[in-house]
Regions:
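Acidic, Ser/Thr/Pro/Gly-enriched alpha-helical scaffold modules and adjacent low-complexity linkers
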Residues: 1-293
Length: 293
């Protein structure tokens, strides 16, 4: 049996908006039972193209917040916090420290969703992954200009002043939510975040991970014991994270885990993303203060 697939190659990780559309088109296309009839695919392509030309990345009249809202579709911070609880903050710390992180398990959709949800916790990072596909790419750092002023009413100005986006997946770094064996050589770089369902990645010796995130066992396995101590939560971290977890638990909707009860703002992904943004801002401010004093 020959398997066929329809694949979208996109410049931005807009998987949430594309997933539903692609599913419907794929089912309709194969239901025709005529692979030579590609009119449906041509119309789908034209629809996507027109959407891209009106996307936030192309249209400067659309705010970065709207841009983010489009990219964040398909991620679920609520489910991440609900499942991983205090370990959510440990995973965030591991990414910020640019460690080698391997996420292992099935299904692939959950594998990828967890990684994109974690990356989305870091302000402005998800829309700036242009260097993540190969360790030798470094456009984000090369094109960076130091902010000389701050306009508090302008979110883009605030992000730039805080040094964002952080070049976490730029030079000598690699991010591949579902990594094929053909890219295993990229794991020789300094830092990476990958997802895999293949045990070969877990047992290869040349580029071992610092930590393995096991979706089956819901646990973090540290190959370096000192790293566990490094990312362990401080009393202040635990208190802060406890508040976040309580908000998620008190608004949990088992019928629709992605949305809080009564569709309120508190407990939503936007609310949680704002809380984690405050955490990252506080972390960066503290690091800068320590550097200057």
């Amino acid at each position: 049996m020959v398997q066929k697939a329809i694949v979208i190659l996109a410049m931005q990780p807009i998987f949430g908006p594309l997933r539903t559309k692609l599913g419907m088109v794929t089912r309709a296309f194969f239901a025709q039972r005529d692979l030579n009839n590609v009119k449906l695919l041509e119309e789908f392509y034209e629809t996507l193209e027109s959407g891209v030309h009106r996307s936030p990345a192309k249209d400067k009249s659309i705010s970065s917040d709207e841009d983010g809202n489009t990219l964040y579709m398909g991620t679920s911070i609520r489910e991440c916090v609900h499942k991983w609880r205090f370990r959510t903050l440990m995973l965030l710390k591991l990414i910020l420290l640019q460690k080698r992180i391997m996420v292992y398990g099935y299904p692939v959709e959950h594998l990828c969703t967890l990684q994109y949800s974690l990356v989305s916790l870091i302000p402005a990072l998800l829309p700036h992954l242009q260097d993540a596909a190969a360790p030798e790419l470094n456009t984000l750092s090369r094109d960076r200009v130091k902010a000389e002023s701050l306009r508090m009413s302008d979110r883009d100005s605030l992000l730039a002043y805080m040094g964002l986006p952080l070049p976490l997946f730029s030079h000598d770094a690699f991010f591949q939510p579902y990594c094929p064996l053909q890219q295993i050589d990229n794991l020789r770089c300094k830092t990476w975040l990958i997802g895999t369902t293949n045990q070969i990645f877990k047992h290869q010796k040349t580029s071992q991970p610092d930590v393995i995130v096991d979706l089956y066992k819901m646990q973090l396995s540290f190959l370096d014991p000192t790293l566990h101590n490094l990312v362990s939560l401080t009393p202040a971290d635990r208190k802060w994270m406890d508040d976040v977890i309580n908000v998620v638990q008190s608004t949990w909707n088992s019928a629709d885990p992605a949305q809080p009860v009564q569709m309120q703002y508190k407990g939503s992904d936007d609310y949680l993303r704002a809380r984690f943004e405050e955490y990252v801002f506080g972390l960066l401010s503290t690091a800068k203060y320590c550097e200057l004093h």
